[in-house]
Amino acid sequence: MARARRRTRPTVLSDRQAGGGSLPAQTGAKRRTAVLRRLYPLLAFLGGFTWDALTIGQRVRVVDFWRLGAFLVGAALLALWLARREALDRAPPAPAATLRGRLASLAWQAPYLLLQFFFGGIFSALFILYFKSSGHLGTWLTASFLAALLVGNEFAGNRYGRRFTLTWTLFALNAILLCNFALPHALGSLQPLWFYASTVAGATLTHILRWLAPGRPGRIGPSWALAVVLMLAFRLDMIAPVPLVKRQLAAGQDFVQASGRYSLQVERAAWWQWWRDQAEIVHVPEGGRLYGLSAVFAPIGVTADLEHRWEVRDPDGWRLVYRRPFTTTGGRDRGFRGYSWVLNPPPGDWRFIVATQDGRTIDILRLQVVRGTPAANEVLVREID
């Protein structure tokens, strides 16, 4: 009689015996990896932003325009490459664990990453430049919009290659904002005409780029719509008067001009008003003068027609009390200085404004004038050299 064969049971190894670690440990590692992947764009953004803030510094240099122009050319070439790949209907490589498969996957993703890098580099630098040129709510909103795009770019990834309308629109925004800076700088003039011309030039450049792209993917209409929105924002004084950058703004008494230095007595801001250079309240004695000082940087070769405006709030709104026009010549690192004053200003709410003579606001200092003399321990001297 044949011996019955014994059925063997397969050996089942636990997760720890199989060398894979416990299931909770594997899950935790995957979660940490996922979190790091999500944080990587933010860390890259902070690193790039810090680098631009340090390298661009406190003034606009010609080398900055050349660098940003190179980024824009790189973005244009990558957009054409992605359009060609789209027209050839090439599929991404299949996932593989081998070195060759990983290199193929990296090569496929490289254009997306480089385009993201170029857009991020331009957005970061332009945000810093527009941030430095912003001086009131409207321009702060525009700078905040650029900041939102800067952060959003870090999470866009390969959407640029799959949604060409987005690619053309962001390219148009980069080209327009860069031309808004570069054209006035090259011509040495801040006439409003150059803003409109540079805006149309940036949109036209994008239109030509799409026309050259194989298959002409995506739509160009949103790029032109963006140009119209920017020109409307310019009319509403929501675009900072680039490339002008406000250095200092102060209002007070006992103005002294000596040995190439301007000094002014101002009142200290409260300890918790860390963002203010001086107190909002200004004490002015009967018959006294209230002085205003400004320092505005303009690049070498740029001439700007500026003005000081003193306005007081009436029951019907803000009323112009005094306006002093003057012309700046660019190139001074600490900014071109100007001063003005009002005699015996009545108590109430005041605004000291430095702006271009065509109406674009550079900065606003809000004040509350009261009669009297400030306490000695609340006074300090500010110098603008």
Predicted regions located by residue number:
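Short acidic/polar inter-strand loop motif in beta-rich domains
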Residues: 356-365, 372
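Solvent-exposed serine/threonine-rich low-complexity stretches and specific carbohydrate-binding patches
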Residues: 320-331
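Membrane-interfacial entry segments at the cytosolic side of transmembrane helices
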Residues: 214-228
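Membrane-interface segments at or immediately adjacent to transmembrane helices
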Residues: 231-305
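Membrane-embedded alpha-helical segments of integral membrane proteins
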Residues: 162-212
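Aromatic sugar-binding surface patches on proteins
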Residues: 290, 329-339
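Short, aromatic- and glycine-rich surface loops/edge beta-strands on solvent-exposed regions
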Residues: 347-358
